[in-house]
């Protein structure tokens, strides 16, 4: 009986010794990956919170509180809207013949001439803005039968009655007659011409006849492809700058070789020339109250300038220049490192070193993947640069491709409509909101997809490194199941280095490894069986010990050495 107990205890001790790897004294080499104490959470396709070693923020949320005049050329409209500058309102003369990449309109700009409206305000504003200049070409028009150069007290220039400098107010001649007018201008140039003209709407019938003689005027403007005919709307309106009449501003584009014809029997506000329209520029207009500074930035918003190489921004949906795309999310983290598994306080079972299956290694600063070994010369840690570089190349390539996909010039201007176009404005806003919603969703999905692939790639590189080492060692070592190998031959630091760099020759150590295996344990046990044997041997020891005690008690009772008395 005592012999059986001793056998069980010996078996238990043998299993314990093999698990701790401390009694055999064999060298151990473990494969691991970098870990940090506090990782970064990213989203993947399957999980909203995956902790990785490192990640890059893709959404820019910072901006400067000023507009940078370089490399984009800015023109400050100050008190003038762009259309006021094109019409030649008093106070806007400084804008004549200016050029720009971005025309800055101020919310404080005001009209300073006869009250007017533009039925197609947004289109005219867009055409003028995209042309990049107010290059005006004066032309000689012959307006027979009328008086030219009309003026108004609502349009003071230098303290005197004046009018829009780019328009000519035609009224009845000194003989009391008005026209009729029939004037043709041919575009003999090589560029598109923009003509601005208008129709005056008097406040009363008396004003109508005083200015134009006829009770009902009419203006017709024609090109080969278009014709518009306007009859004035006579009637009183709320006074603006002491005027109850209004002027409606219209515009006509005339292509090279085409002609424009003006016909009128009254109420025509005639052009004095045309604007040269260039379709090759990508200029625009921006409404902002931010001052123009002396900084440099390729991206402007209504809230200031953005200086960032990130593919997305959450500063403003109104962005001009080489800008990140606007998304609704305040943060999109792109994984640039592997899954983070912080190291435990005790490395491995009973304090032994452990590999990547059990935990990551903090302090592996010169690489993502590496080796940790323990042999007769001590312990050491070294990075595996090849697998690290392979993972870094894939992730950097992924990051560059993502930036390329979203690095195209993003250009979103603020649309402005007249009140009568409210439904169009609502539709435009709905379309823009829908586009932003779709792009924001696509951006989040794209980043989640890339994160999923990044984590899969880094896990794959770890497995590739493990398989490479396993194929090198073959039967010379045993896989312990936690990312470590127990080597069954003497392996100094040079030997360890050969395993790391892939020059290890298992044939050199094969015989020594086989002999050591036989000495340590004739039967090779896997890590799972070692655990089972440990518990079985422990249980057998306990069972035999209890059986021995019971047997002794029964033997003593039979011989009268022990007497049991039960009291009730």
Swiss-Prot record:
Q: Which InterPro entries match?
A: Capsid_hemagglutn, Hemagglutn_HA1_a/b_dom_sf, Hemagglutn_influenz_A, Hemagglutn_influenz_A/B
| The record's account of how the chain is modified after translation | Palmitoylated. In natural infection, inactive HA is matured into HA1 and HA2 outside the cell by one or more trypsin-like, arginine-specific endoprotease secreted by the bronchial epithelial cells. One identified protease that may be involved in this process is secreted in lungs by club cells.
Q: Name one GO biological process term.
A: fusion of virus membrane with host endosome membrane
Compartments (UniProt record): Virion membrane; Host apical cell membrane
- What GO cellular-component annotations does this UniProt entry give? host cell plasma membrane; membrane; viral envelope; virion membrane
| Primary site of residence | virion
Q: Where exactly are the transmembrane stretches of this chain?
A: 532-552
Residues assigned to the Extracellular compartment are 18-531
The segments annotated as topological domain Cytoplasmic are: 553-568
List the keywords (alphabetical): Clathrin- and caveolin-independent endocytosis of virus by host, Clathrin-mediated endocytosis of virus by host, Disulfide bond, Fusion of virus membrane with host endosomal membrane, Fusion of virus membrane with host membrane, Glycoprotein, Hemagglutinin, Host cell membrane, Host membrane, Host-virus interaction, Lipoprotein, Membrane, Palmitate, Signal, Transmembrane, Transmembrane helix, Viral attachment to host cell, Viral envelope protein, Viral penetration into host cytoplasm, Virion, Virus endocytosis by host, Virus entry into host cell
What does the annotation say about its assembly with partners?
Homotrimer of disulfide-linked HA1-HA2.
UniProt protein name: Hemagglutinin
* Biological source species: Influenza A virus (strain A/Mallard/Astrakhan/263/1982 H14N5)
């Amino acid at each position: 009986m005592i012999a059986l107990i001793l056998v069980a205890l010996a078996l238990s001790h043998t299993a314990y010794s093999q698990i701790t790897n401390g009694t055999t004294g064999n060298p151990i080499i473990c494969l691991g990956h970098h870990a940090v104490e506090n990782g970064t959470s990213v989203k993947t396709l399957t999980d909203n919170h995956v902790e990785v070693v490192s990640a890059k923020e893709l959404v820019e949320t910072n901006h400067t509180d000023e507009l940078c005049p370089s490399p984009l050329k800015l023109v400050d409209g100050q008190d003038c809207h762009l259309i006021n500058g094109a019409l030649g309102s008093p106070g806007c003369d400084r804008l004549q013949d200016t050029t720009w990449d971005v025309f800055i309109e101020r919310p404080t700009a005001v009209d300073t001439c006869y009250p007017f409206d533009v039925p197609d305000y947004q289109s005219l504003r867009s055409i003028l803005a995209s042309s990049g200049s107010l290059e005006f070409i004066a032309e000689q028009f012959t307006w027979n039968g009328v008086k030219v150069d009309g003026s108004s007290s609502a349009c003071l220039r230098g303290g005197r009655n004046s009018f829009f400098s780019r328009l000519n107010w035609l009224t009845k001649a000194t003989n009391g007659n008005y026209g009729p007018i029939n004037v043709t201008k041919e575009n003999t140039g090589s560029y598109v011409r923009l003509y601005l003209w208008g129709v005056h709407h008097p406040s009363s019938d008396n004003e109508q006849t005083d200015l134009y003689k006829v009770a009902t005027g009419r203006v017709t403007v024609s090109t080969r492809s278009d014709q518009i005919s306007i009859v004035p709307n006579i009637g009183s309106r709320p006074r603006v700058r002491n005027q109850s009449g209004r002027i409606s501003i219209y515009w006509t584009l005339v292509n090279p070789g085409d002609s424009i014809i003006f016909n009128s029997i009254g109420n025509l506000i005639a052009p004095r020339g045309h604007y040269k329209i260039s379709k090759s520029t990508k200029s625009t207009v921006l409404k902002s109250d931010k001052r123009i500074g002396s900084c440099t930035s390729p991206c402007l918003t209504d809230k200031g300038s953005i200086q960032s190489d990130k593919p997305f921004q959450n500063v403003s949906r109104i962005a001009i220049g080489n800008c990140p795309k606007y998304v609704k999310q305040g943060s999109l983290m792109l994984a640039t490192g592997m899954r983070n598994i912080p190291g435990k306080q005790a490395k491995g079972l009973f304090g032994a070193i452990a590999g990547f299956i059990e935990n990551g290694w903090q302090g592996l600063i010169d690489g993502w993947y590496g080796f940790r070994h323990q042999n007769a010369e001590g312990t050491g840690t070294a990075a595996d640069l090849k697998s690290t570089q392979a993972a870094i190349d894939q992730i950097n390539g992924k990051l560059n491709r993502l930036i390329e996909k979203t690095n195209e010039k993003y250009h979103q201007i603020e649309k402005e409509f007249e009140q009568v176009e409210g439904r169009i404005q609502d539709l435009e806003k709905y379309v823009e909101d829908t586009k932003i919603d779709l792009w924001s969703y696509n951006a989040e999905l794209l980043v989640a997809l890339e994160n999923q692939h990044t984590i899969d790639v880094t896990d794959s590189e770890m497995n590739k490194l493990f398989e490479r080492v396993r194929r090198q060692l073959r039967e010379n070592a045993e896989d312990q199941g936690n990312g470590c190998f127990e080597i069954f031959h003497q392996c100094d630091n040079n030997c360890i280095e050969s395993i790391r760099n892939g020059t290890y020759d298992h044939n050199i150590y094969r015989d020594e490894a086989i002999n050591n295996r036989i000495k340590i344990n004739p039967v090779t046990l896997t890590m799972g069986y070692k655990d089972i044997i440990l518990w079985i041997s422990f249980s057998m020891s306990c069972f035999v010990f209890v059986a021995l005690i019971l047997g002794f008690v029964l033997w003593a009772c039979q011989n009268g050495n022990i007497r049991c008395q039960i009291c009730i």
